């Protein structure tokens, strides 16, 4: 059996009780942290808290060589973990389908995601979010500025009067990324990049969702580009038009100066 467990947003306490129990009951536990991280903890603390040994896999070990996980799941109870939810944004549907093709039973234990936290913290209504996008570092996509696909996603959402959740690039355990380079894109870096195609546009920063000290800030992208927002992880939201309740919440919790 292969159980997918989302670990939540921040530290070893973010996992649900159901997720914790599944991990403790497993014969083997695998995890990946190349797409997102639990910033408030480390692998050793996770292992101590969850009373298990965690076998960490890199991107190639999940996408190109999943055999160790699948072979173990054919005869043992195996858990595969990620930050957030294993099937939301950081999707591992391919691994689940490979397991199903081999007759391996699968189960999903959901975790809190950045998508739900962004709506909760900002007061932006969840059903008014359109397609999300990820903003990569310029050096990561081999071009200058913002990729056309990111611009198109934001423009399409704005045409439909929808909010856009922008995930910010993470380069952790990436063999193609120099250790001296940034590993976590900051909201100010993202605002700098996006302010060119979207001048005079409102942005909403969400930093450290799920932690004891989350931060929410709203201003124009040009202004956000000049500010700092502390430790990662950061998200950026480009809102559509605001419902009065959304506007009131951003003014109250994010310091937005809305006309």
UniProtKB/Swiss-Prot annotation:
Key words of the record: Methyltransferase, S-adenosyl-L-methionine, Transferase
MF GO annotations: diphthine synthase activity
SUPFAM superfamilies: Tetrapyrrole methylase
EC number: 2.1.1.98
GO biological process annotation, one example: methylation
Protein's pathway: Protein modification; peptidyl-diphthamide biosynthesis
Family of this protein: Belongs to the diphthine synthase family.
Quaternary organization: Homodimer.
Protein name (database record): Diphthine synthase
